[in-house]
Amino acid sequence: MSIRAKRRKRASPTDLYRTCKQAGTCPPDIIPRVEQNTLADKILKWGSLGVFFGGLGIGTGSGTGGRTGYIPVGSRPTTVVDIGPTPRPPVIIEPVGASEPSIVTLVEDSSIINAGASHPTFTGTGGFEVTTSTVTDPAVLDITPSGTSVQVSSSSFLNPLYTEPAIVEAPQTGEVSGHVLVSTATSGSHGYEEIPMQTFATSGGSGTEPISSTPLPGVRRVAGPRLYSRANQQVQVRDPAFLARPADLVTFDNPVYDPEETIIFQHPDLHEPPDPDFLDIVALHRPALTSRRGTVRFSRLGRRATLRTRSGKQIGARVHFYHDISPIGTEELEMEPLLPPASTDNTDMLYDVYADSDVLQPLLDELPAAPRGSLSLADTAVSATSASTLRGSTTVPLSSGIDVPVYTGPDIEPPNVPGMGPLIPVAPSLPSSVYIFGGDYYLMPSYVLWPKRRKRVHYFFADGFVAA
């Protein structure tokens, strides 16, 4: 007997309408029911065009009789009247102003009426008497002092118990004009000295720079650009315009352009730059000065825009453009010569050669003519300088000709290295057998036969040693 599958209840029309309306997969009876477009709804719509049933409540509603409900014929609906307290008029509360006191007094102050001055009492019967004068000249007052010099005296005192820094001001310079002295009021005595200020360094700013800045709590090291990274392409620029006008190598000159440290280039279409090394360059960052292999190098990092995606993003490699400004010379130490320089003006009689006359005379007779460039002793004069010894010594001055160079300084004798004779090859030695006679012979510890190992047979003498 097969078990019949349980039938699942379909969802409500409202839930089905929410999910299948946008996808367009609704059953044919869902949309008319939810949108009230069934056959019954259409009959009511068409019938209501010619028949009006008023408030009878005939429709597809809940059957409660409409908004007012069912009432008997010939009567009126009851009206619920709510009887409550009589409403009071609102009381306007006036806020207290800033000049009004915060404490309200219960008893008002009595007003004081000032009576004023008393009326004058007249004793005469004719009223006031008017006095007249016949003098018509105006009165002139002489305010000129009798003396010709002006004397000004002042006194000041200092109260140590009271000091007001906000009021104390430096006295201003007085102005004297004729006999009139105009001065400013001072508070106490002040001693000061006017020192002219001198500007040592000026900057080419616009004058709107801030006077001071907030100091940093510590020194922060700014990391330099990684110019020689593997991700950067190294390009050497030989044009010196790269130092001051790098934009001229990417685009042509624009007189309206305002240079900055980081230069951004906008290329709407393909173009040919003045320098082919700067092809597809869209940005050149701030310059940097470095020392590289003994030279001062001016560097800038650039970014290419080789590819452009549909979203407008540019993709390209980073390029390191550099220009070597000047080489850095090696540090040279100032060397001082230990001996004075040679003088070629008078080089005669620089060295004296001493020899015995008995030995020198036979050598001079047998000496052949000296070749060019050698030392000649035949033309020199022989004179005895000492007669105190058995054999007299003769002074022979050294003649310096044009072909014989003469140098001053100590005599240096090179070492006498004897020459090496011919080398005789040694006959190769033949290996010979070594015979050991004895009974004490031990193997090396590494060659000891341990149990559970294969047997080893040693045939060489080097695998063991002889007991002494």
Curated annotation (Swiss-Prot):
It is found in: Virion; Host nucleus; Host early endosome; Host Golgi apparatus. Its main location: virion. A motif (Nuclear localization signal) lies at residues 1-11, 449-457. One of its GO terms (cellular component) is viral capsid. Highly phosphorylated. Transmembrane segments: none annotated. Pfam families: Late_protein_L2. Interacts with major capsid protein L1. Interacts with E2; this interaction inhibits E2 transcriptional activity but not the DNA replication function E2. Interacts with host GADD45GIP1. Interacts with host HSPA8; this interaction is required for L2 nuclear translocation. Interacts with host importins KPNB2 and KPNB3. Forms a complex with importin alpha2-beta1 heterodimers via interaction with the importin alpha2 adapter. Interacts with host DYNLT1; this interaction is essential for virus intracellular transport during entry. This is Minor capsid protein L2. It comes from Human papillomavirus type 2a.
